[in-house]
Amino acid sequence: MARSLKKNPFVANHLLGKIEKLNMREEKEIIVTWSRASTIIPTMIGHTIAIHNGKEHLPIYITDRMVGHKLGEFAPTLTFRGHARNDNRSRR
């Protein structure tokens, strides 16, 4: 179910503060976060945010097409290694 339009999009306070500080100083540096539930807002465009995937932080460059999506959508947590092989030779 989509979030109500009466509410603002969720962005973690610590993440929003870091982005605002970097925008005021006009600096670009990698921002490390565990907040996968935060929504990407227009002030984040042009920054690189390292999003935690459960094991490591994946650096993601934020573009204008990502606005409105969640950070977690761009850092996959599962790696598919293929289905189990049906190896008939090893059964004999």
From Swiss-Prot:
This is Small ribosomal subunit protein uS19c. One of its GO terms (molecular function) is rRNA binding. Belongs to the universal ribosomal protein uS19 family. It is found in: Plastid, Chloroplast. Keywords: Chloroplast, Plastid, Ribonucleoprotein, Ribosomal protein, RNA-binding, rRNA-binding. Signal peptide: none annotated. The gene is rps19. Protein S19 forms a complex with S13 that binds strongly to the 16S ribosomal RNA. It comes from Illicium oligandrum (Star anise). One of its GO terms (cellular component) is mitochondrial small ribosomal subunit. PROSITE patterns: RIBOSOMAL_S19. InterPro entries: Ribosomal_uS19, Ribosomal_uS19_bac-type, Ribosomal_uS19_CS, Ribosomal_uS19_SF. Pfam families: Ribosomal_S19. GO terms for biological process: ribosomal small subunit assembly; translation.
